[in-house]
């Protein structure tokens, strides 16, 4: 019954992702933004505490970082943009409003691909300031304002996801891209990358639902999947009973592995947005944008394409290698050193694919110096000198001890010979190339 219901219904998931930028100072003041693990309320000033008369001054570097992110997500960068006040009341928001962006964000209309062909549309990428942090101790709640005013980029996607697996892949790819740009460590556990999925259920090929549920308090990729899967199941069970889920904000309880009601979800008009009067609108010249674009490094998707085209390595291997920029850079440096040292001595194999295999399969650890890695790689790549007499003696023993396998091979089971190759390689302890073993075995078997 449940599978039939699922056949008729389809989850609709959009994402709001917040990225804390790794600038030295906060978004609108000169306080240090390096708040993690610091003494509470030690990185504050009248601006980030919202004291009367304090005026905000935008952080130029943070805006440049946002433009890099937007470019990496193939967004259109607007020529003009402005900041707005987003009003709501919460203890961690000292001003009673958050400086954010509403109707004129810095960038809009982007798109990225997950896997090879699934497109995810990016609605907007805009700038705002982070809030303080509430710390609950017993029957008291304390506030640490060190985080208040830290530059925060919000990335909003269209509701293009229908399952938690695609969400997880998208987030992992986004985290990798952010780290390549070197604008944030994008660490979910530290809170420098946060996810709020918006989930609803609609009939397949039907119109969008007239509600959506936002999930907060998700701080790892593992819990992303669990929170979304639980919420999809919860909403479907309600719909099966004829109940439309409430439009609300829910939290995720990691211990219970469940979502729970936090508050009724607000509409945009509830925030009473209006332009920030203390910050003039921004105008971005073509030269200014081009200078920022020129500073963007090669990103993972382009690196994957280059590895496949230039190094002739498999897509899956190229994808794995580019998940970590340090590993990817090490791979390229290792290729250069190994090829230089071999000096075309090894022509019969794809050296790049072999080195990729050494790294991915952890046959040679990348914790080694490049020199030591190169020495080990050359040893593995170089043809082995084979003692033919020793090899033939081992082959005779293997044939003698595996009469049934030999019989099967002679009856036409071609794969049987590979078992014999494996036995010979095992007994000779790797002192011969597999292709030499195969050749000598075929001679012996006739």
Mark where each language-model region is:
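Short, charge-rich amphipathic segments
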Residues: 1-6, 65, 95-116, 152-168
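N-terminal, positively charged regions that mediate nucleic acid binding
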Residues: 2-81, 86-88, 161, 172, ...
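Charged, compositionally biased, marginally structured helical/coil segments
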Residues: 5-15, 19, 35, 143-160, ...
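Short, well-ordered strand-loop elements centered on a beta-strand within folded domains, enriched
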Residues: 11, 26-28, 119-124, 209-215
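Short acidic, Gly/Pro-enriched loop/turn segments at secondary-structure junctions
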Residues: 23-31, 133-136, 205-208
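Aromatic-residue hotspot detector
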Residues: 28, 79-89, 93, 97, ...
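Glycine-rich, flexible beta-strand/loop modules in the N-terminal catalytic cores of phosphate-handling
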Residues: 39-44, 48-51, 119-121, 126-167
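SsDNA-processing nucleotidyl-transfer enzymes
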Residues: 68, 72, 77-148
């Amino acid at each position: 019954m449940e599978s039939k219901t699922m056949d008729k219904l389809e989850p609709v998931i959009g994402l709001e992702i917040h990225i804390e930028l790794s600038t030295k100072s906060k978004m609108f003041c000169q306080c240090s933004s390096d708040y993690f693990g610091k003494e509470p309320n030690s990185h504050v000033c009248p601006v980030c505490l919202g004291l009367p008369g304090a005026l905000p001054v935008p952080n130029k570097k943070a805006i440049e970082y946002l433009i890099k992110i937007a470019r990496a997500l193939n967004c259109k960068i607007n020529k003009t943009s402005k900041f707005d006040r987003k009003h709501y009341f919460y203890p961690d928001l000292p001003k009673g409003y958050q400086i954010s962006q509403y109707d004129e964000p810095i960038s809009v209309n982007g798109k990225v691909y997950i896997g090879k062909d699934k497109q995810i549309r990016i609605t907007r990428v805009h700038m705002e300031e982070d809030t303080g942090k509430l710390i609950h101790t017993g029957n008291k709640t304390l506030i640490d304002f060190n985080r208040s005013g830290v530059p925060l980029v919000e990335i909003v996607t269209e509701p293009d996801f229908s399952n938690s697996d695609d969400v997880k892949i998208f987030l992992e790819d986004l985290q990798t891209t952010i780290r390549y740009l070197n604008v944030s460590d994008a660490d979910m556990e530290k809170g420098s990358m946060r996810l709020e999925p918006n989930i609803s259920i609609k009939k397949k090929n039907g119109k969008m639902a007239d509600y959506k549920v936002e999930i907060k308090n998700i701080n790892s990729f593992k819990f992303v999947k669990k929170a979304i899967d639980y919420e999809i199941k919860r909403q479907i069970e309600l719909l099966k009973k004829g109940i439309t889920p409430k439009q609300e904000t829910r939290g995720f309880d990691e211990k219970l592995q469940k979502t729970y009601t936090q508050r009724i979800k607000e509409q945009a008009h509830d925030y009473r947005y209006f332009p920030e009067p203390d910050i003039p609108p921004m105008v971005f010249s073509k030269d200014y944008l081009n200078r920022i674009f020129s500073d963007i490094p090669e990103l993972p998707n382009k690196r994957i394409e280059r590895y496949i085209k230039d190094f002739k390595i498999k897509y899956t291997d190229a994808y794995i290698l580019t998940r970590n920029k340090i590993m990817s850079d090490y791979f390229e440096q290792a290729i250069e050193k190994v090829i230089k040292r071999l000096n075309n001595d090894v022509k019969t194999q794809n050296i790049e694919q072999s080195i990729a295999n050494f790294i991915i399969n952890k046959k040679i650890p990348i914790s080694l110096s490049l020199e030591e890695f190169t020495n080990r790689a050359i040893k593995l790549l170089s043809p082995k000198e084979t003692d033919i007499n020793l090899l033939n003696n081992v082959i005779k023993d293997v044939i003698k001890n595996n009469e049934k396998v030999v019989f099967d091979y002679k009856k036409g089971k071609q794969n049987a010979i590979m078992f014999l190759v494996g036995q010979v390689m095992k007994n000779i302890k790797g002192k011969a190339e597999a292709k030499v073993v195969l050749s000598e075995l075929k001679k012996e078997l006739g």
